[in-house]
Amino acid sequence: MHWRIGLIGYGEVGRIFAQDLRAKGLQVCVHDTKANALNAQSAELMDHAHRHGVQWKTSHAQVCANSDLVVCAVTASQTLAAAQACAPHLLSQAFFLDLNSASPGTKKAAATDINQNGARYVEAAVMTSVPPYRTQVPMLLGGAFAAQASTALNQLGWHTRVASDQLGVASATKMSRSIMIKGMEAMVIESLCTARHHGVEDAVIASLYETFPGVDWEKQASYFFQRVIEHGRRRSEEMHEVAVTVSEAGLTPWLATATAQRQSHMADLADAGVFGNKADAGFARNPDWRIEADRLLHSVSTNQHKPST
């Protein structure tokens, strides 16, 4: 298969996919609006692309005009805007793979824009963390073109399966799961920071081991802190989409909304440097959650970064 592949978004997922696709000898190009800022972050992204042989494009249109498959991996709040920016420029019959964590309603709206311009929209739901699996991360696909896309992607070594030929099923699965996963992250951070403040964290951890003996709570807690410190903003935006999904079911999204707030607050702290310099190699990689909890507690105790209410 000699697909030309375009990436919209060059965050963690985009960079991982680019590296793996280039390793297979495929032509890859990318556009990320963050590069428009011309700052250290944009320079780092473009340097990464250059080192891996990824062609940097200056617009959505340039990516779409040169791609048989466009993989969209932006933040949740930009899902529809990214699809609309790409739609007029996609090649006829090109696949548009929407990896974004968005509600079924948002995915359906994006599909309308893509399909009416002659391309093929495929809803995708990434079902676990990407870094351990890379392009083999388990992925659910949905929509009228899901079966065609799944066959082609699996030939590239991806791990996809069709959830439904109807749009919304894959994303509903992902969004419902996120209530649990992102909610657990928020609960663990809030629970253990509270316990740490009161000096009872060891007792709480011991109780968790007794109740859920199959989980390494020390390791899991540190991993949750790491992921939220690094990706809290993205997770917060996803949880706002989850809240929309919950509302579509006729329920009040109390948990989804609270989780979004906790994730957003962690992102604010990270942006303010509470957890260290983002440019440092060790940022969000601390193996001991207690160190990050102490940083958080010190910040809020001095009224430096109290969450808004």
What function would you assign to each model-found segment?
Residues 102, 107-182:
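Rossmann-fold dinucleotide-binding core
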